[in-house]
């Protein structure tokens, strides 16, 4: 059995496990919990009644957080020539072509997001086993395979996040830091909840979003009533 810290136990005692909270209430409760000497990350987790093994129920997409995540993403871009220059000028942290592909294949993973121009995807595709499991593989559907590398880089730097349901039907999102005010966290939470609802597969009947939780790095999750997200 995991032994929890005194602060964690104190925080857990504040959560009524027989109650489901609104997002506002959950955020306020989370911010009232004992403080730590670092700025905790705040996360939203949703449980969906989907079967990710079915292609038409694989919920994935992107969302722009109105207040960002509180972390500036480190962006890697696979491009060459003028497009590589554009990516660098747009603020990409790492830019390259064949040599960079080899470097990533060799284990380099010090980045948070990946963008590629279409002409690079023939070779970038070889990195599927490295990038795929980490949710970093560029994809046209999420705007990360594109000739407009300037927009892609600036969107990611500005708070655009990518998501994909896991094998158990869960979606996790970073929605900010504990230093954010409550309204900013609430607006970020609503942005991701609205996008998740918008992407409900047509083949899913009945309740789709079955569970929602807001949590932070060191604190227990606070359950949010899915009915309040309608």
Curated annotation (Swiss-Prot):
**MF term (GO), any:** structural constituent of ribosome
Which keywords does this chain's UniProt record carry? Repressor, Ribonucleoprotein, Ribosomal protein, RNA-binding, rRNA-binding, Translation regulation, tRNA-binding
A cellular component annotation (GO) from this entry: large ribosomal subunit
Superkingdom of the source species: Bacteria
What Pfam families is this protein classified in? Ribosomal_L1
Q: Which CDD domains match?
A: Ribosomal_L1
Its GO biological process terms? regulation of translation; translation
Q: Does the keyword Transmembrane helix apply?
A: no
Keyword field contains Signal: no
Q: Which family does it belong to?
A: Belongs to the universal ribosomal protein uL1 family.
- Tell me, in a sentence or two, what this protein's role is: Binds directly to 23S rRNA. The L1 stalk is quite mobile in the ribosome, and is involved in E site tRNA release.
Q: By its UniProt entry, which HAMAP family does this protein fall under? A: Ribosomal_uL1_B
| Oligomer status and interactors | Part of the 50S ribosomal subunit.
What name does the UniProt record give this protein? Large ribosomal subunit protein uL1
Q: Which gene encodes it?
A: rplA
């Amino acid at each position: 059995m995991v032994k929890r810290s005194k602060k964690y136990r104190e925080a857990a005692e504040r959560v009524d496990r027989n109650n489901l909270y609104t997002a506002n209430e959950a955020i306020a409760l989370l911010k009232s919990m004992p403080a730590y000497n670092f700025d905790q990350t705040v996360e939203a987790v949703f449980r969906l009644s989907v079967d990710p093994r079915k292609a038409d129920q694989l919920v994935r997409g992107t969302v722009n957080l109105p207040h960002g995540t509180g972390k500036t993403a480190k962006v890697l871009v696979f491009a060459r020539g003028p497009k590589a220059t554009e990516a660098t000028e747009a603020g990409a942290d790492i830019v390259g072509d064949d040599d960079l592909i080899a470097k990533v294949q060799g284990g380099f993973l010090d980045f948070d997001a990946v963008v590629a121009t279409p002409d690079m995807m023939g070779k970038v595709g070889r990195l599927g086993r490295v990038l795929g499991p980490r949710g970093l593989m560029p994809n046209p559907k999420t705007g990360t395979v594109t000739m407009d590398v300037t927009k892609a880089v600036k969107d990611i730097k500005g708070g655009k996040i990518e998501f994909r349901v896991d094998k158990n039907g869960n979606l996790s999102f970073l929605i900010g830091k504990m230093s954010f005010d409550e309204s900013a966290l609430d607006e970020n939470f609503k942005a991701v909840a609205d996008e998740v609802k918008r992407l409900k597969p047509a083949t899913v009947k009945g309740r789709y979003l079955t569970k929602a939780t807001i949590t932070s790095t060191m604190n227990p999750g606070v359950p949010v009533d899915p009915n309040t997200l309608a």
